[in-house]
Amino acid sequence: MSDKLPYKVADIGLAAWGRKALDIAENEMPGLMRMRERYSASKPLKGARIAGCLHMTVETAVLIETLVTLGAEVQWSSCNIFSTQDHAAAAIAKAGIPVYAWKGETDEEYLWCIEQTLYFKDGPLNMILDDGGDLTNLIHTKYPQLLPGIRGISEETTTGVHNLYKMMANGILKVPAINVNDSVTKSKFDNLYGCRESLIDGIKRATDVMIAGKVAVVAGYGDVGKGCAQALRGFGARVIITEIDPINALQAAMEGYEVTTMDEACQEGNIFVTTTGCIDIILGRHFEQMKDDAIVCNIGHFDVEIDVKWLNENAVEKVNIKPQVDRYRLKNGRRIILLAEGRLVNLGCAMGHPSFVMSNSFTNQVMAQIELWTHPDKYPVGVHFLPKKLDEAVAEAHLGKLNVKLTKLTEKQAQYLGMSCDGPFKPDHYRY
């Protein structure tokens, strides 16, 4: 691998801009800054060779530099062909950290980028930090000889976690993994509050559409769907939910949303957002019944929720309006506006989640990497969670920035509740 490129980004000349953006983001990411303060001297990740496959954004750049500060060697690729922020990638490359990512990769380039992160100067990767499971799957299928040397996987997102559990059930998973997604300070913050802000940002930047007065259809009412529905309602849209789960459907109904099927909702909606992580949510028969210039987008991890293939094969005309905005004319004369080719709209058409909420998620990632690297005996092959105490520590690290003052339990109160004054304050099954 001696002839490997030290990095490949769109434009290394963007590094100075990227560095300015990182400086601002650091001030909004108190959890990661706390990790640096606490562990920069002890370097708990010394010896770790972390291959990361996660959206190469400004926030991710702060995560990468935190991992390096804690002693790790790091090589990086993005987990989505459109999600890289080129100035952030340039800043990381300029800092001497191998990164292989640019906005607008082809599928072939995407795979090439991931493969560049597998071998370091001192040997192959020994840790995985993944978002969506593409790196994990690639190692298990194409590079199984590397598996014995890998100490652990930390997985960022719902789709990747589903993949891990599926692999475990089928006896395919060969490496211990920590499910970062289902840490409370990830799923109840990044998935909900992050999407609540970044969805609208993506739709607005792509289309400049007025949301007030429109009918918005949100497929799925998990944490991501909840955040999207709140945002659209907040901007004045009438929101319709589609759901498979009776509990989530009841939650949506109790919040005042109409809940129906996509076969019915497709005739009413002006804006469609898929959030499910499942295949075949919006199909050809739905497109054919949509209103003229219906806006269709996805905020789930992969591009499988919207049948983009059907659009490309059946539309009479496809006009590219601007990057990641395409207008299809159907045989019935009506048009469909598709954002980000059915991939993540908030990263394809905007800048993704704000730095503060990503600090929650990425502090969990750092803790997961430290746990797996320093305590391998605690984590046999399987899918694990971070301890509740660490989840609470992530939240606590972010309170000062918001000027939050916690009430402290007295010894008498703690004894009455049967817990320590310092937590954990909830049982593992508590849902928040």
From Swiss-Prot:
Subcellular location: Cytoplasm; Melanosome; Nucleus; Endoplasmic reticulum
InterPro entries hit by this protein: Adenosylhomocyst_ase-like_sf, Adenosylhomocysteinase-like, Ado_hCys_hydrolase_NAD-bd, NAD(P)-bd_dom_sf, S-Ado-L-homoCys_hydrolase_CS
Lineage: superkingdom: Eukaryota
Function: Catalyzes the hydrolysis of S-adenosyl-L-homocysteine to form adenosine and homocysteine. Binds copper ions.
Modification Phosphoserine occurs at: S183
Cofactor: NAD(+)
UniProt modified residues of type N6-(2-hydroxyisobutyryl)lysine: K186
Gene3D superfamilies: Adenosylhomocysteinase-like (3.40.50.1480), NAD(P)-binding Rossmann-like Domain (3.40.50.720)
Outcome (variant: Y7F): Does not affect nuclear-cytoplasmic protein distribution resulting in subcellular localization similar to the wild-type protein
Modified sites of kind Phosphotyrosine: Y193
Annotated Gene Ontology cellular component terms: cytosol; endoplasmic reticulum; extracellular exosome; melanosome; nucleus
Enzyme type, top EC level: hydrolase
Transmembrane segments: none
Name the record gives this protein: Adenosylhomocysteinase
